[in-house]
């Protein structure tokens, strides 16, 4: 046990040098960026007896490969993490049945191509007890649209106006066909900024304290139904799969989300619980189209043809070869056929002017260098990277590999060759969000700097088209165009393994890691 605790401390130190700076004000816990999660004095008094009995219940402890770095709801991907941690909610949410529902919106309708109206329920509350009405939704969603450019991908800049306390007017810059899907996008969470600049949210849990990228300590939100039946939750970050397994074996964590294939097998062999799900995520490579050897389309084609994706599936012990940009259980998933042709790949490199010499290709006196880059919070990608490096060496590449934190920062900098990346590409059940994010010209997450009039036109048509069958056809065409132009490299449609204790044997993860901590976790 002592050895394990030492391992855990070391793991945490490696993950981050961030420290918790917590303060108390009127018995309301806050973090260093002033995220407030509050209860009134009366509520505390009313729950005194319940709290006494609940104090005897051990917290649910979850081990993950990542933990949020901050709690600013308008900061890049932070809102996604807050929802995954059970602190925030998007306006609409995807259920286990794949259907969208909302605790905040009663109904909505399209007024004209760029205008919608929505009627709010005004029954859900923030964690401080304030009602979520039309004005509250307008305030937070407008703030997101102004401060987080990732929220502008699907419909351009969107403005929200509260006509009264139950009526919301929504105006979009580009046409939008599925308002509920748009409001399910992970950027669009419900929050309120208080006069002291702190935030309150609406999820089933509130933040008691946290250490950036290391640990989140959560308590049930008293203003969320069923709070008295929920235990406290602690989320711990592990970068090392062995340390996470040690923690799980020792009974120190109730859930390991996710575990590598090897660890999953060892846990199963010990007759312990492992849940396997279709991740919904896609594993793919991001090419740098602006500089380096990958500017040459023939070099990108050679990589696409020269790698053996089946070897990735074998090493990951599950998943499928990708057929496009979406998980294959979606009706708009691509129909791209990926195959290996090593001889054709070598011929393309020959045509590009790279001549093999001493097992490395050379052109104009320079070797064919490529650096593969990935990040530690998705261990599967490291496995793929190691295999891919060997495959590319066989083609004559001089390959370097690196694992970095802050992968999006590296991607935005443009200082990379080929990034191995993971993304849930349809968390809303619609293809428009991710296709616009990654492939529309000049979008924030278009890390490749891909520009295609044909793609932009397809995405414009997708925004205007109401017919479901035609929308599916447009999404498939967009994925075929990606396979042709190769701004990214389709790799794997993965499965994930999650280890759970007997206490959580009934827990069923879904939709990737978007709702790890949810209202059913007890």
What are these regions (language model features)?
Residues 63-111, 200, 512-514:
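N-terminal lobe/hinge region of extracytoplasmic solute-binding protein
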């Amino acid at each position: 046990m002592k050895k394990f605790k030492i391992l855990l401390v070391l793991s945490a130190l490696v993950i981050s040098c961030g420290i918790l700076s917590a303060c108390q004000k009127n018995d309301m816990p806050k973090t260093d960026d002033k995220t407030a999660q509050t209860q009134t004095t009366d509520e505390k008094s009313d729950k005194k007896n319940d709290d006494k009995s609940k104090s005897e219940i051990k917290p649910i402890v979850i081990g993950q490969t990542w933990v949020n770095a901050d709690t600013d709801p308008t900061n890049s991907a932070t809102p996604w993490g807050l929802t995954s941690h059970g602190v925030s909610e998007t306006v609409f949410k995807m259920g286990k049945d794949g259907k969208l529902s909302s605790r905040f919106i009663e109904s909505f309708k399209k007024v004209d191509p760029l205008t919608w109206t929505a009627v709010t329920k005004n029954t859900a509350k923030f964690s401080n007890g304030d009602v979520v009405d039309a004005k509250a939704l307008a305030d937070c969603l407008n703030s997101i649209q102004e401060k987080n450019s990732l929220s502008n991908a699907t419909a351009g800049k969107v403005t929200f106006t509260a006509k009264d306390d139950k009526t919301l007017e929504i105006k979009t810059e580009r046409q939008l066909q599925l308002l509920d899907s748009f409001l399910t996008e992970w950027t669009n969470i419900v929050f309120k900024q208080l006069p002291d600049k702190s935030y309150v949210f609406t999820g089933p849990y509130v933040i008691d304290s946290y250490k950036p990228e290391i640990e989140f300590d959560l308590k049930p939100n008293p203003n969320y139904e069923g709070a008295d039946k929920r235990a406290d939750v602690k989320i711990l970050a592990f970068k090392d799969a062995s340390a996470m397994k040690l923690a799980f074996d020792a009974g120190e964590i109730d859930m390991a989300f996710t575990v590598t294939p090897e660890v999953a097998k060892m846990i199963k062999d010990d007759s312990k619980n492992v849940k396997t799900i279709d991740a919904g995520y896609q594993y793919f490579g991001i090419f740098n189209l602006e500089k380096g050897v990958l500017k040459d389309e023939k070099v990108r084609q050679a990589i696409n043809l020269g790698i053996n994706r089946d070897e990735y599936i074998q090493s990951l012990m599950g998943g499928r070869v990708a057929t496009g940009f979406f998980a294959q259980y979606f009706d708009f998933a691509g129909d791209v056929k990926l195959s290996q042709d090593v001889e054709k790949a070598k011929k393309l490199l020959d045509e590009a002017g790279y001549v093999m010499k001493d097992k490395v290709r050379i052109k104009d006196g320079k070797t064919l260098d490529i650096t593969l880059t990935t990040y530690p919070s998705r261990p599967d990608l490291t496995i793929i990277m190691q295999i891919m490096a060997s495959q590319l060496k066989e083609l004559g590449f001089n390959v370097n590999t690196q694992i970095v934190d802050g992968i999006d920062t590296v991607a935005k900098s443009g200082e990379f060759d080929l990034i191995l990346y993971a993304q849930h590409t349809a968390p809303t059940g619609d293809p428009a969000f991710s296709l616009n994010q990654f492939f529309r010209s000049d979008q924030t997450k278009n890390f490749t700097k891909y520009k295609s009039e044909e793609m932009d036109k397809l995405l414009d048509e997708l925004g205007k088209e109401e017919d479901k069958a035609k929308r599916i056809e447009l999404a498939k065409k967009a994925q075929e165009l990606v396979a042709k132009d190769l701004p990214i490299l389709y790799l794997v449609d993965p499965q994930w393994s999650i280890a759970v204790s007997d206490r959580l044997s009934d827990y069923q993860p879904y939709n990737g890691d978007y709702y790890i901590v949810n209202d059913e976790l007890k």
